[in-house]
Amino acid sequence: PGHSLMPATADNPEGYWEDAPLVGLDDALLRTLGLRWDSLPPPPSGWRTLPIVRRFAADAARVVAEEWGPARFAVVKDPRLCRLLPLWVDAFTAAGFDASCVLMARRPQEVAASLARRDQFAPEKSLALWCAHLVEAERDSRGLPRTFVAYDRLLAEPAATLDRLCRDASFPLQPDAEQ
């Protein structure tokens, strides 16, 4: 992650491990597109070519430079990336990074229960959001080195999962089973 992580909250005391400037930019772009993080419709067709999005592309490049600067690699976590991935792939590529994607999948019932607790969402909305995020991330990450990781597998077998993740997504890490 970058330098400016979102703080922990009462409903997530361990923290989100999400970069606040990136999340803020994603939320602002979604608002500009008439969406929110929990909107069911995808961004409009051709959203990347809209003139206003060019400003966000420049802001994304600035965020990458400020948060990751000369780092050899960057790890970014923000569920909004599922909807806005092309913008960030372009920003990281322009900064000299080779983009790879990890598509982390939690069981849909776990996601629905979590969103019901935190946001009082109906199970149907939560499941539809889960599906939309996963489908858009899969579509927009085609052509990039990527891997799919089951969240429960990561928790059960962290060393083996990280080893496979690094190999499949071409990450320059050699995970240490002791860490």
Regions inferred by a protein language model and the residue ranges of each:
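PAPS-dependent sulfotransferase catalytic domain
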Residues: D38, P42-S45, V53-P175
